[in-house]
Amino acid sequence: MGNSLISLLSIFHLLVLWGSSVNAYWPPSPGYWPSSKVGSLNFYKGFRNLWGPQHQRMDQNALTIWLDRTSGSGFKSVKPFRSGYFGANIKLQPGYTAGVITSLYLSNNEAHPGFHDEVDIEFLGTTFGKPYTLQTNVYIRGSGDGKIIGREMKFRLWFDPTKDFHHYAILWSPREIIFLVDDIPIRRYPKKSASTFPLRPMWLYGSIWDASSWATEDGKYKADYKYQPFTAKYTNFKALGCTAYSSARCYPLSASPYRSGGLTRQQHQAMRWVQTHSMVYNYCKDYKRDHSLTPECWR
């Protein structure tokens, strides 16, 4: 009886320790869920194929796109927006995906070639046994064209993005850009000047493509097409905001309960946890960079 009781207490102690360990590696609740304020959008009503139509398949309202040796694929929103909430549930492919980029992003590249704005969520493919890297980026007025001035922040997620769908979103307002994962803010990019913030209308895009020259460990590992096709699945599309044609009275959704924007204290705590435990690169802390080109880092 005594030994049995000791064994049970030992098991209970281990479970408590295990639970504490799990919670230690999971962000605290943000306390507010902006995705719940936006209804899902039928893919055919909100988007169109951009390229690689033969590498795109719909099953009800779940979209699969894939990359093989012949082509990748991409889609684009029908409407351009000047602000709004943009998201989707995405599930990534496990295994060897080095060199492959899966993305959800805002851009006006087709409207302003060589001088465009862009706000990115990109999943950088990986090798066996290593996690994906989620890269967020902001380009302003051609900083992604020719002379690259990226504003990258990279994260290793606290879950396996190949096991299930998770919701990834960009909330873009005239004051700030907030990147969210399952409604947890992971990055806030405030407007500090017109020269460092995208203000022109953009479209929402998604794509899968070969970026072997840089995607995985700066191009060390390339796409290997013996593992093709490389797939990505999207569902629960959300795109709600002020279009390029909306009146000046149109007001974008906020990431928090505050109509004026910003984040609550609880959301800040969740974001701080992510940036402490999951962020692996911050362009503002890269001292090899010329930060005269990124003045928002020192203002």
UniProtKB/Swiss-Prot annotation:
- Binding-site positions, xyloglucan: 122, 135-137, 145-152, 213-214, 289
Q: Name one GO cellular component term.
A: apoplast
Q: Where in the cell is it found?
A: Secreted, Cell wall; Secreted, Extracellular space, Apoplast
Domain (GH16): give its ranges: 25-234
User: Tissue expression, per UniProt?
Assistant: Predominantly expressed in stems.
Signal peptide residues on this chain, from the entry's feature table: 1-24
Q: Which SUPFAM superfamilies match?
A: Concanavalin A-like lectins/glucanases
From its record, what is one biological process in GO terms?
A: cell wall organization
In what way is this protein post-translationally modified? Contains at least one intrachain disulfide bond essential for its enzymatic activity.
List the disulfide bonds in this chain.
Answer: 242-250, 284-297
This protein's source sits in the domain of life called Eukaryota
Which reactions does this protein catalyse? breaks a beta-(1->4) bond in the backbone of a xyloglucan and transfers the xyloglucanyl segment on to O-4 of the non-reducing terminal glucose residue of an acceptor, which can be a xyloglucan or an oligosaccharide of xyloglucan
| Pfam families reported in the protein's UniProt record | Glyco_hydro_16, XET_C
Keywords noted in UniProt: Apoplast, Cell wall, Cell wall biogenesis/degradation, Disulfide bond, Glycosidase, Hydrolase, Secreted, Signal, Transferase
Q: What is its EC number?
A: 2.4.1.207
- UniProt-annotated catalytic positions: 118, 122
According to UniProt, residues marked as the site described as Important for catalytic activity are: 120
Mind listing the GO molecular function terms for this protein?
hydrolase activity, hydrolyzing O-glycosyl compounds; polysaccharide binding; xyloglucan:xyloglucosyl transferase activity
Q: Which InterPro entries does this chain map to?
A: Beta-glucanase/XTH (IPR044791), ConA-like_dom_sf (IPR013320), GH16 (IPR000757), XET_C (IPR010713), XTH (IPR016455)
What's its job?
Catalyzes xyloglucan endohydrolysis (XEH) and/or endotransglycosylation (XET). Cleaves and religates xyloglucan polymers, an essential constituent of the primary cell wall, and thereby participates in cell wall construction of growing tissues.
Matching entries from PANTHER family are given as: XYLOGLUCAN ENDOTRANSGLUCOSYLASE/HYDROLASE PROTEIN 8-RELATED
Q: What else is known?
A: In contrast to group 1 and group 2 endotransglucosylase/hydrolase proteins, it may not contain the ligase activity, and may catalyze endohydrolysis xyloglucan polymers only.
State the protein's name: Probable xyloglucan endotransglucosylase/hydrolase protein 32
Q: Which organism is it from?
A: Arabidopsis thaliana
